[in-house]
Amino acid sequence: MINREEKRDAIFFTKQLVRLDSSNPGNYEKEIKDYIESILPKEGVVISTSEVLPNRYNLMAEIEGEIKTPAMIFICHMDTVMLGEDWTKDPLGAEELDGKIYGRGACDMKSGLACAISAFCEIAREVKEGKRLKHSLKLICSADEEDFMRGVEKAIADGWVQKEDWIMDTEPTNGQIQVAHKGRTWFEITIDGITAHASTPWKGADANAAMAEVIREIRLSIERLKPHEDLGISTVTFGQIQGGYRPYVVPDHCTVWVDMRLVPPTNTKMAEEIVKQAIYKAEQTIAGVKGHYKITGDRPYVEKDENSYLLHQLKQCADEVTGEDTKISFFPGYTDTAVIAGTLGNRNCMSYGPGNLELAHKPDEWVAIEDIVRCEKVLKKLARTMTGQQSE
């Protein structure tokens, strides 16, 4: 009887990965990158690294097939959010309890990364034993997904992914295949006013009051946008605001950082017009203020492609493994595959992984072991299907 801690399966890899701190910001990805590099098979596997930021790397492992493009690609990020507080479990402990593994990244997305590693290693073993691949198989482990997603941008720039490739991330999707994304546009909006004593406010121009007008107008404009049949409604969050100096001083400066999640047909250019109009109305309402803005993030929406070859194959594999009709939905956040789809126009990008996104980024984050087992089986089956594995 093999002890599971000695069996190099996705459950084992999940625990090993969770025990390595790869928080962003914090310890970052180097330890986990080095660990993955150390466990990957060397025979028949081409391993590449690429520096994304100082001492922060992407890692790619490739088993070459007769056809290099399209390749089947698993892309998984190595970083997690910060460990945080209010845990009742050790965030780096990988404790197994009642069919769950606890720890930072257990759900998002070290269990998904573990499933991809396990599937890749199994295909590598089968190739070593004499199987041949028609299409190449790649495992890309990316940096910085939890921040500005510079890892996947570097992978695109390095040519590690192509428009024609079949690409899947293993983000937590709660048993669903998620194939579409709302766009994500970020703005930094600033209102400049005129300072004055609070006893004579008419001598100044209240930047905070003007920003309140901007926020109100943007919120109402976003609420008026039509919903999308798959992606739902567009939303806006005013995540951070800074303004004023003291309660008794008319504020001469206010800045707000805005996160918009946009559904078709609204894009960043259209959102920019909403911001411009909001600033204009604030300037007309509060005399003496002047507003300006900059776009700090621009990720386009990604719509479902009913004709996607990867989608059909992934659904068939998932249905066969689970014995159920796997649901197809959209991913509420933005992922590495969404960046690839939006940048390259790749219509074969999607998410499927263990865990529930609602558990991510929280204390006592966990993933169900049965979820890991399911996903591992699906990924192995998908890898064999998409690479067109053949006997010698």
Where are these regions (language model features)?
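Metal-dependent amide/peptide-bond hydrolase catalytic core
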Residues: E5, S48-E51, M82, P172-T173, ...
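Short beta-strand segments
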Residues: I75-H77, I140-S142, M168-E171, T190-D192, ...
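Acidic/histidine-rich catalytic neighborhood of metal-dependent amide-processing enzymes
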Residues: M109-K182, T387, S391-E392
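Acidic/His- and Gly-rich active-site-bordering loop/insert found
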Residues: M1-A106, R125-L133
